[in-house]
Amino acid sequence: MKKYLHILPACFLFYAAAHAQQKDTVYVTDFGAVPYSYENCVTQIQAAIDECKRTGAKVLSLPEGRYDIWPEGAIRKEYYISNTSTEQECPSKVKTVGLMLHEIDDLTIEGNGATLMYHGKMTTIALEHCNGVRINNLHIDFERPAGSEIQYRKVTGGETEVTLHRDTRYEIVNGKIRLYGEGWRSNRNHCIEYDPDTESFTYSQGWNTLSASDAREIAPGIVRFNTPAEFMPKAGNTLTVRDIIRDQVGLFILESKNITLSRLQMHYMHGLGIVSQYTENITMDRVKCAPRPDSGRLLAASADMMHFSGCKGKVIIDSCYFAGAQDDPVNVHGTNLRALEKIDAQTLKLRFMHGQSYGFNAYFKGDTVAFVRAATMERFASATVRDVRRISDRIVEVRFDRDIPTSLELNHDCVENMTCTPEVEIRNCYFTRTSTRGTLVTTPRKVVIENNTYYKTGMSAILIEADAEGWYESGPVKDVLIKGNTFIDCAYNGGPGHAVIAIHPSNKIIDAERPVHQNIRIEDNTFRTFDYPVLYAKSTAGLLFRNNTIVRTETFPAVSGNPYVFYLNGCKKAVIEGTVFEGETPRQSIKTENMKRKDLKTTIK
């Protein structure tokens, strides 16, 4: 027995060493990240992330405080990201990534209320090929957001005086104003104007006028312009100005699985927002996309706030808050590629068509696809992917498990990935301060949009498209429930039919016997609206609008010129019943075209 005793200490040391390698929590402060140091800690936090991957730690903890992150020392990596930039707008797809999580499983980043303060133009965090990652209770902001804010202070014929937000950096050069940031200058700008009296976000040419006018600084942060006499903007309104080039994104989740963002606060996102691309099972829990309350800013995103492209499994968005987007707060879709050439009986050459979406993996071996007629948006055949070969950034060759349909029209019809389509739940959210839509969603799987508030979205609060000739984003929906939501004064900037809810597929051939969308139910909602149009529906079968309340307000003057509450085009088996009108009752409630009388059942006379 004694001859084995000398082995025991060695075994104990081995066990202790192995146990040390599997510690549960890693602290960024142990790697030199110091809160409130205002020094660049990108390499220190990245080292802590890498340690989690090496040891299998379950928690990465950031003690409360502010941590500054600069591009210097950050990871640079090429990513092709959906809906971002063309080859001409941004030839390089290399992103500057603040924090990189690559092939990491079962990790919680516990923010403890800490703030990551970014500098320059950066993609704040990237998750690539991760599984079971959770980001919790973290704030993300930029020292100098790429969106500038300029408030009209005094306006007289020929002179306009403005106040620039303290986070907006500017310079007067040769009598003209320039906007710049930390390592960048704003060149190609898009402008949205905010009216605090009406709480509306409208398109504006105000920046074009100011930037072309002679300017002089009369005090720090106050600039006076010599403007045309007819230029008379409203004093107190604010211009939100940002560069149109989407060269970075707010946060990027690529080809990952089981990702949760909880109590994450995104106070500014440059380019595009939180982009989830070909990822399975994503939960957004109490995520807030809005400026810090103490910042005095209006803008939180240059474009979309949450963008889901080609995802699958479940997308759950619960109790989130969206305010200050210059595009859509939530956008869920896939990507249709056009069939260019038949290589052999089972192989097609396909092309990414939209300028801003290309280069990423759109198909994977084993995926089920549908062949889609662009003119009608019909899915007319299916197949399974056997092999994918990248030819160029725009072109891929895909081999299928069966012969390509003989009726496929090359250079017109498309191929849709049906596997990479998610179920979607959007519940208990608040949408406001956007010039565009609140929610865009196209997926053939189940969609529930329930108990949300849409407050003064500039265009339709909810838009359901299906597109194989414009953005090339997805095909028909089959199961959508819109229930228990409140819509308040939406669509003042327009949208399909100026309607609060718009169902607007891109099909050019409208035939009620060949509908695009199916089974859309709109029930128990309240619409408080200044204009008449509530529902615009095109090419939809099984449309139900039941037990909804419509209240006429006087917030804005009616702008649509459309006296109809409901406009149905090419729909089949539509039902409108149980509608309660409060206030003014329109004399002309329903307009139909390209459909038979029997295809609408209604209790409205």
Curated annotation (Swiss-Prot):
Intervals holding PbH1 repeats: 256-278, 312-334, 421-443, 444-466, 477-507, 517-547
Keywords assigned: Glycosidase, Hydrolase, Repeat, Signal
Signal peptide: 1-20
GO terms of molecular function: alpha-galactosidase activity
SMART domains: PbH1
The enzyme's E.C. designation: 3.2.1.n1, 3.2.1.22
Functional summary from the UniProt entry: Alpha-galactosidase that specifically removes branched alpha-1,3-linked galactose residues present in blood group B antigens. Has no activity toward linear alpha-1,3-linked galactose residues.
UniProt protein name: Alpha-1,3-galactosidase A
Gene field: glaA
